[in-house]
């Protein structure tokens, strides 16, 4: 059985849209706490991240949410600032050896509406809502190319993520300006399906010259990847 299933034999990361208090108590209460912050305290979380393992793609990467990459035509009519959700993966590309911006995907598919990242993005307005995937298949880039991800690399990735969040929170306005100026055509929505850019000009930050894919029909979707041989959900 897939270890993401609860006692009701359901994939718990497909129950975030309308969790049942009896069948999915962990999801129900976790979402309730976040919803309380948003609707009662009027404090929308700055960042949400679901941590997953990935059985097919390599490296560490994000799944995120973009209006421009949504299956819903109504979403695509809503203006958005892509730097709001793209800056964090750009920072990690510069600072985290195991992270791959090129593997990130910000497409919102219909079949993902009940996942944590999409439900919290859509229902509660959390712009930086992600799934962080760490591969079971190791890395094919950078200093860890050809090696599996061990506890050292996972701890390092955790530190890199926390440091990137601090950088984003403290210097996000500077990074937005640099990123927009380095690739203005991207943020003029001329090519809404692809994000090409760089974060350069800040001390200690390397130039980035790769691409983050918003929509790529050839990419495997995250539900197709979940342990689909040995760990298939029944």
Task: Annotate the PLM regions.
Residues 1-234:
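Structured catalytic-domain cores with a bias toward divalent-metal coordination
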